[in-house]
């Protein structure tokens, strides 16, 4: 990481226009204030300073009274307050493309001190050129950026001095994409840590390239005013570049700079190494961070650190203290055609021309660029307009503490299913897609809420050992790729049904859930006190494991009870008198032993409470593409005669159970028929399309029959198959041609060959389960009857499905309804192949905006309880 160089104290002219009285932040100077201690916690305020109710702006303004690093001198008398960080009328709007990645400051980094919630700006800044233009700008009539604060903020830019902390912007890069800016709150705190590092080290290292050669040498004479650069001190030209010079490890040993919590508290930035690390999960790919000082016009992408540092040093050495233009808010700058460069600076592969103090252009020195520049200049075009790239000093929007995130009041643990062994880290990417979709929905539908929902991935598979490599050693070599794919995906189902390895899978997920919750609470100590809620989103097999953890279901214990009952029923037909006498004594002894055990267990239960499997209560349990219903049916769960969720998941364990599935997902099954059997003939609730206007709340949607009877008092075998429309405000279409295509969204998220294999298998089952895709209205009644057979209830709990009281409109009578609907179905697309959907639908939930809206609707539901109840009449 390159760092700006040293300089003399700021000229009083910079602050003269606003009544300043001294030098402000000075990069690398001996009069620089020291900021020791923690970065993530604002714990440096002396006695009598503002506490929890005020933001410690002194950290960024350098106010007197700050604690200094050991051995540092107090030079606070040199520092002046910067009004841009305290002005009540200061306007700010983040230009960060990912600015919706929010977090809150209370309890950051292990539960440090808190800062008050700041009032949002009244008028957002809309830069005049942030959305247009290219990297190579600078032609006649080029539009310029607008600083916040209007003309009143102009005075602090009259004189060229070092960039203030609010003008610098820090960036990060993920997946080798473009640089993304941190929000203002994060950028200011990273800059604070960076300046703390500068003050604590006091080093003057020379930047070197990987070969050990200096890259920050004196500038080559390239213009009329460049000769004086050679007389500059070497350190002034090079600046402070410890990480690039290879001194990062040495600094880390000598100076302990605490990492800065950023991006909603999900990541931490290490300014010593110049990298960003996730907090709650492991990630092999490094996320570099960069300090931006000079930016490309139009895109506002930062220049590379080496070049930016050199240009900044040259700019300060040449123009320090000089007057800038009269007004910074000029909408259109004067064309530079015909202007001669007043200063030039040679870089390794480029050179920079200054046409004025704030008109700077970057040119490539590649041979092709030189030829093109020569040709265009002969055609009458200026050098800048033909091949120059306009540069800006300082970011388009200044960083402010007001640009801070909302408070997290709801966390969502995202649990993966099978296939993670084959594609480790996939759940992290899937959670990132779900988080990004949720941010878009929050900005669109829940922007007026002061709270925030955060998604955390739960990766439990990679830490398990299971059988080691035993299965791999017995796998034949033929079609090895397909076999390895099955071993890495479908084998997880075999492991979970095995009594030997099932406990390892359950404990692996249970420990990871508790670890993440404990870590989150340690970094957010007020989460539980303020009533924070926890939900779980599970996919595929993860739904079954999560369910068993919450309910404590253990097949080994049930098997032991079954064996015990069988032992108590021996065959007495061929027993002698002596054998029967001994058997009676054995029964008496066992009964006495059982009574003693029960008394002992009772004493233990009264003296200590049983530790729950999870350290938190689950508010909502969302199942996506879940086979949970099949597992419950095979365990003997049969429909009851009440419509309560407690029949399969007690409310004291989980407040709400919701089952989300795509109609063609071959792995997903319905849960409602396990509670009330006749719900197999009631259509699942259709999930609203994310851009549906004024959708009816789900709790007010009446259930409708899949096959409504002609006779309103009975359901015959030759019943019609027309679908009664659901009471939604969207246009009434058939269920197959209604709403968003989840498959189209999911084509980009086919999770490897394992998912394709599962999808192909599901496609074959779908082929035999349906007559054809060209006859969607003839959804086989035989297949429905076949699905009813394995879950047929005993005679004592059977709910009659031949005489169901319902209204003439085709809706079920409320006496036989569920307390809350559980099955929610995504809508199929207008143009969609069911065979292709069978391949892709199981992995298409992560990026769906429909799913994101559905999740957030129930998580924010407690804030909508006071809304006016809409009409219950069917649409």
Curated annotation (Swiss-Prot):
User: Which segments show compositional bias classed as Low complexity?
Assistant: 217-228
Q: In which pathway does it act?
A: Phospholipid metabolism; phosphatidylinositol metabolism
Please name the catalytic residues of this protein: 540
**Region (Disordered) residue spans:** 1-30, 101-153, 206-231, 770-804
> What keywords appear on the UniProt entry?
Cytoplasm, Hydrolase, Lipid metabolism, Phospholipid metabolism, Phosphoprotein
Domain of life of the source: Eukaryota
| Protein name, per record | Phospholipase DDHD1
User: Per the UniProt entry, what species is this protein from, by scientific name?
Assistant: Bos taurus (Bovine)
